[in-house]
Amino acid sequence: MSVTVETPLQAGPLLKEKKQELIDIKNIQEHARTVQPFKASKHQPLISGSVSKEAAIATHAALHIDLTPEKEKKIREMYDRLDADNDGSIDIRDLTQALSSQTPHIPATMAPKLLAKMKREDSDRVTYADFTNYVIAHEARLAEVFDQIDSNRDGEVDVSEIKSYCKEMGVNLDDHKALSIVKKMDQSGSSSVNLNEFQDFMLLYPSTDMREMVDFWRHNLIIDIGEDGQVPEDFTPQELQSGVWWRHLVAGGVAGAMSRTCTAPFDRIKVYLQVNSTKTNKLGVVSCVHLLHAEGGLKSFWRGNGINVIKIAPESAMKFMSYDQIKRWIQEYKGGAELTTYERLFAGSSAGAISQTAIYPMEVMKTRLALRRTGQLDRGMIHFAHKMYDKEGIRCFYKGYLPNLLGIIPYAGIDLTVYETLKSCYTQYYTEHTEPGVLALLACGTCSSTCGQLASYPLALVRTRLQARAISPKNSSQPDTMIGQFKHILQNEGFTGLYRGITPNFMKVIPAVSISYVVYEKVRKQLGATMS
């Protein structure tokens, strides 16, 4: 193999041939390791002025002879945007920051994999030459993928072609989901995607494996933040057969256990305020902390956390199995058609109701244990449950069941509806032909979740009071029905009485979500569950 070079080289971003000389390819590789580019932040050409023959050879090898001025300018500008600290190279911090702020459709957790694709093996940084090589090679592979998706060879990929391609990969999408993917890639508003749009959108996704790309579209471009807590994850038949599903359930279980344990003090304070705070005693968060610490010390803030963690496994398994079966029934009723967003919401809410019914006795025990005093658990949880049964019978394990069940649907429905409405309004007024960024989606998700909690919290409070009624002297004379509790609270404490304890409930949201996300990602990777 040989290349054509010049001696000397004129200033400029491209190489103009004056004198031809054939150089063996092994010499090119030798020289390419020694040539350092200028800083891209200055928008200077890689080679400027008269340089040696070796530098010209290395430059040709790195930039490819057929690179046009327009293409080089585009690559330079892209490189400059990624080089956040303007030090002339790209490292892991630059990529993480860029993925977070510039490409919200690609998770920042992909930065290490992307860096490995771009850099040389003997370096932990990406030079301009490395980046150019990556862009050209990656775009070439993306062009091959685009050709496979573009079944009618018209140079455009539309909704039907996305659906067909995903189906070949074992993923069935309805029109709504396929349109969501196309809209995120489409820059012109044409409801289809050309090659340049496809390459621009997928350029920083560090893989061209067809199966991985379809997984990326399905899990990152469709599932909305507002649904995450309400509708269980969907798994394809291939993922069910390969065992991916259980790895994600295990990762989710470990993440949930860590999150609940770290935020258990917030949960105990909330439960205590729900049951004991009134208009007359004016018990607040700070005074509650002092009271609980004085009664049982620091360890007392984790009362009830053990059973709260234990119930994760049966609840998750029951919800997953129920959700999968309900989806199948709905699909059979519809003749095999894909589920809509609200059909998934119905299936998820129904699965949640079934799983809650199965593990509800553990919910009651969690509340009782969170409210217990020092010394009331001297012989373990089983003995504690046996004492409850002896004193109150089997019905005590389902106290507050009705408000708990009724609280599932309004929370899920309001959360999803508000989220979709806010996202639609944002897209209509603040963006053109593109989806909102990460910060906008997080804001929509936070608002929708808050609305869902505000709507369902009175039911949660009544549920907790009914669960705790037998062991709380203050509540011994209170009604033992849901409607009776609502009347009692409104008559004696007013409307604000329905929101006792909501402050610590909101306080735990950010740390709970953050811890859960970090632990989930770590465990998922350790188990080898690759989901982009």
Swiss-Prot record:
Binding site for Ca(2+) 2: D150, N152, D154, E156, E161
Signal peptide region: none
GO terms (BP aspect): ADP transport; ATP transport
Organism: Caenorhabditis briggsae
Lyase listed as a keyword: no
PROSITE patterns: EF_HAND_1 (PS00018), EF_HAND_2 (PS50222), SOLCAR (PS50920)
Stored PANTHER family: SOLUTE CARRIER FAMILY 25 (PTHR24089)
Family classification: Belongs to the mitochondrial carrier (TC 2.A.29) family.
Domain EF-hand: residue ranges: 70-105, 107-136, 137-172, 173-208
Protein location: Mitochondrion inner membrane
A Pfam family assignment: EF-hand_7
GO molecular function, one term: ATP transmembrane transporter activity
Transmembrane region(s): 249-266, 304-323, 349-362, 400-419, 442-459, 501-518
Protein name: Probable calcium-binding mitochondrial carrier CBG00135
GO cellular component: mitochondrial inner membrane
Ranges for the Solcar repeats: 243-329, 339-425, 436-526
Keywords: Calcium, Membrane, Metal-binding, Mitochondrion, Mitochondrion inner membrane, Repeat, Transmembrane, Transmembrane helix, Transport
Positions with a binding annotation for Ca(2+) 1: D83, D85, D87, S89, D94
